[in-house]
Swiss-Prot record:
One Pfam family, short name: AMP-binding
Membrane disposition: Peripheral membrane protein
Origin: domain of life: Bacteria
Catalytic activity: a long-chain fatty acid + ATP + CoA = a long-chain fatty acyl-CoA + AMP + diphosphate
Protein name: Long-chain-fatty-acid--CoA ligase
Family assignment from sequence similarity: Belongs to the ATP-dependent AMP-binding enzyme family.
Record CDD domains: FC-FACS_FadD_like
EC number, UniProt record: 6.2.1.3
Main subcellular location of this protein, as a coarse class: membrane
UniProt keywords, alphabetically: ATP-binding, Fatty acid metabolism, Ligase, Lipid metabolism, Magnesium, Membrane, Nucleotide-binding
Assigned GO CC terms: membrane
Length: 562
C-alpha cells in the first residue's frame, strides 16, 4: 500500500528510522548506563535505583544464573511479580546472561501458571512471595529446576524493607503459606552473584529476547517469539512518538509506570523506551489502590504517564486526583484498549495534556500505529502506522480496500515477531511472506487515519488484557451441571468490555453464584464472567456451530452506546 499516511506525519519528522545503532538490548542498556550512571533509573516506594546500581545488580544477577544455576544461552527464565525494583534487575540480568525472559501474570491461577511454564519450558522462575503458593501447587509438573524467591520490600533500605515485609505478611496477610524448600532468595542471588565472573554473551538482533504470551481464537495461550531486533525496532518507533515531548536528555525527567511490566505495552513503551531516553521510571506496584496511587503521584512532578482507559477513568473519578501537580506533564499515552472520548476530554480538561492513543498487538512488540504529535485532540482513531511499518487492508474477497472501505489490517515491519513458540501451524495462519494478519477490521478514512470498526477475532478485551472465549467456555464446561456454554465480550463503561457467558443447563439446580465460584477456582479475576444468562438453547448454524456473533449483536443492540 502506498504510504499516503506520511502526509499526517509532523513536519520535519523522520519517515524512516535507522535502528542499526544497537545489535541487542544489551547494547541499549550499556549506552544508558554509560550516559546516565548516577541518574535515577527507577523509583519504587520512595527507594531510588540509579542506572549504576541497576547495572551492578543486574550483572550480579546474570553472573549467578551463569555460574550457580549453570544456565545456558537460550534457556527460558520466567518472571512472576508486580512492578517492583526487583523486576528490572531480574529482567536485565536474564537478558545480559543471554537467556530468554518469559513474563507471567502474577495473578494467574495454578492452572494458568502451569500451562505457561510447561509450554515455555522455563527452567527457572523469579517469584514474589505473595504468589509463591500458586507456584508450589504446580512447580513439580513443569521443567522448572530453580526458584528465586523475593519479598515485596527486598530492594528497599533496611528499615523500610523490614517494615514493608512485616506489614505485607502479618498485617495485610497477603502472603499465603507456601513451601518451596529449594528456593534461593533474591538477596542471596545478588550477594553471591557479585563475586562471580560475568561473561557477556554475543547477542545478535536475531536472537530471542522474550516469549511474550498471548492467545487466539483457539483459546490456547501462545508464546510470541520476540527477538532483540523486534524490540529495538519498536523502542525506536515509540521513541519517534515520545521524544518530541520528553527528549531533553541533558536533565532528569520522570514518568509514571503504573501498567504492569509483564504486559508487553508496559515492557516496551515504558520500561525499555524510558531506558533509551534516560527517563526515571516511577514504579507503581498496585495501581488498583487508587487512593495510594494518587498519594504517590502527589510526590512527583512527572513529565509522562502511560495507561489504559480503565486507569485514566479511575484516576479522574478520584476526588484527590485534582490535587496532583500536572505542570510538568507533557505526554499521556493510552494503549491496550480504546480510549473513550469522555475520558480523553476530561483528562485534557484537568491535566492540560492530550492522551495520545496507540495501537498494537503482542505479536508486533507491540506498537503498530499511533496518533501523531500534531493531532491536537483525541479523535477516536488509532492514528497512522509508525515509521518502518507497512500496512495493507484486505477485504473479504481478497482485494485491497480503498479509502473508506473496511478490511482486515495486515502489518509488515521489523517489529513483527518471528512466530509462535513451537507452534508452526498457528504461525502459518497469521504470518504470510512477512505479513502479519492482525484480525482487526479497520477503515482508513479520508484524513488517512486508521479507525478500528470490529475485531475479526473473538478475543475479549478487558481493561487492556486479552481474554479468550474458548478458555472461559472450557472452564465453564468442567461443571457437570452445564450442557452448553458460549462466552462473548459485551460493552462496559469502565473496562471497555466485560465477559458474558450464555449457558444451557444440564441440571436445573445450577445457579449463577455457583457457576461464578466454579470459575474462580480456575480463572484469574478479570476472566471470571461478570454476566451469566441461562437459555434453553443457543443459536447455531445448520452444522451445529454456535453463532457467537448473533449473541454479540443481540447484546450490542439492547445496550446503550458508551
Amino acid at each position: 500500500m502506498e504510504k499516503i499516511w506520511f502526509q499526517n506525519y509532523p513536519k520535519g519528522s523522520e519517515k524512516f528510522l535507522d535502528t542499526s545503532k544497537y545489535e541487542s538490548i544489551l547494547d541499549m542498556f550499556d549506552k544508558a548506563v554509560r550516559e546516565h550512571p548516577d541518574r535515577p533509573a527507577y523509583i519504587n516506594m520512595g527507594q531510588v535505583l540509579t542506572f549504576r546500581k541497576l547495572e551492578e545488580r543486574s550483572r550480579a544477577f546474570a553472573a549467578y544464573l551463569q555460574n550457580e544455576f549453570k544456565l545456558q544461552r537460550g534457556d527460558r527464565v520466567a518472571l512472576m511479580m508486580p512492578n517492583l525494583l526487583q523486576y528490572p534487575i531480574a529482567l536485565f540480568g536474564i537478558l545480559r546472561a543471554g537467556l530468554i525472559a518469559v513474563n507471567v501474570n502474577p495473578l494467574y491461577t495454578p492452572r494458568e501458571l502451569e500451562l505457561q511454564l510447561q509450554d515455555s519450558g522455563a527452567v527457572a522462575i523469579v517469584v514474589v512471595s505473595n504468589f509463591a503458593s500458586t507456584l508450589e501447587k504446580v512447580v513439580f509438573n513443569t521443567n522448572v529446576k530453580h526458584v528465586i524467591l523475593t519479598r515485596m520490600g527486598d530492594q528497599l533500605s533496611f528499615g523500610k524493607r523490614t517494615l514493608v515485609n512485616f506489614v505485607v505478611k502479618y498485617v495485610k496477610k497477603l502472603v499465603p503459606k507456601y513451601k518451596l524448600p529449594h528456593a534461593v532468595t533474591f538477596r542471596e542471588v545478588l550477594s553471591i552473584g557479585k563475586y562471580r565472573q560475568y561473561v557477556r554473551p554475543e547477542i545478535s538482533r536475531e536472537d530471542l529476547a522474550f516469549l511474550q504470551y498471548t492467545g487466539g481464537t483457539t483459546g490456547v495461550a501462545k508464546g510470541a517469539m520476540l527477538t532483540h531486533g523486534n524490540i529495538i525496532t519498536n523502542v525506536f518507533q515509540a521513541k519517534w512518538i515520545a521524544e518530541p515531548f520528553i527528549g531533553d536528555h541533558s536533565r532528569t525527567r520522570s514518568a509514571i509506570l503504573a501498567l504492569p511490566l509483564y504486559h508487553v505495552f508496559a515492557l516496551t513503551v515504558n520500561c525499555l523506551l524510558f531506558l533509551e531516553l534516560g527517563v526515571t521510571a516511577i514504579l507503581i506496584t498496585n495501581p488498583r489502590d487508587i487512593e495510594g496511587f494518587v498519594k504517590e503521584l502527589k510526590k512527583y512532578r512527572f513529565e509522562a504517564i502511560t495507561g489504559v482507559n480503565t486507569l485514566f477513568n479511575a484516576l479522574l473519578n478520584n476526588e484527590n486526583f485534582k490535587e496532583v501537580d500536572f505542570s510538568a506533564l507533557k505526554l499521556s499515552v493510552g494503549g491496550g484498549m480504546a480510549i473513550q472520548q469522555s475520558v480523553a476530554t476530561r483528562w485534557h480538561e484537568l491535566t492540560g495534556c492530550n492522551i495520545i492513543e496507540g495501537y498494537g498487538m503482542t505479536e508486533c512488540s507491540p506498537l503498530i500505529a499511533a496518533c501523531p504529535i500534531n493531532v491536537v485532540k483525541h479523535n477516536g482513531t488509532i492514528g497512522v502506522p509508525v515509521p518502518n511499518t507497512d500496512i495493507k487492508i484486505i477485504k473479504d474477497d481478497g482485494s485491497d480496500a480503498k479509502i473508506g472501505e473496511a478490511g482486515e489490517l495486515w502489518v509488515k515491519g521489523d517489529q513483527v515477531m518471528r512466530g509462535y513458540w513451537q507452534r508452526p501451524e498457528a504461525t502459518s495462519e497469521v504470518l504470510k511472506d512477512g505479513w502479519m494478519a492482525t484480525g482487526d477490521i479497520v477503515i482508513m478514512d479520508e484524513s488517512y487515519s486508521l479507525r478500528i470498526v470490529d475485531r475479526k477475532k473473538d478475543i475479549i478485551l478487558v481493561s487492556g488484557f486479552n481474554v479468550y472465549p474458548n478458555e472461559i467456555e472450557d472452564v465453564v464446561m468442567l461443571n457437570y451441571k452445564v450442557s452448553e456454554a458460549v462466552a462473548i465480550g459485551v460493552p462496559h463503561a469502565v473496562s471497555g468490555e466485560t465477559i458474558k457467558i450464555f449457558v444451557v443447563k444440564k441440571d436445573d439446580s445450577l445457579t449463577r453464584d455457583e457457576l461464578r465460584n466454579h470459575c474462580r477456582q480456575y480463572l484469574t479475576g478479570y476472566k471470571v464472567p461478570k454476566e451469566i444468562e441461562f437459555r434453553d438453547e443457543l443459536p447455531k448454524t445448520n452444522v451445529g456451530k454456535i453463532l457467537r456473533r448473533v449473541l454479540r449483536d443481540e447484546e450490542i443492540a439492547k445496550r446503550p452506546k458508551h
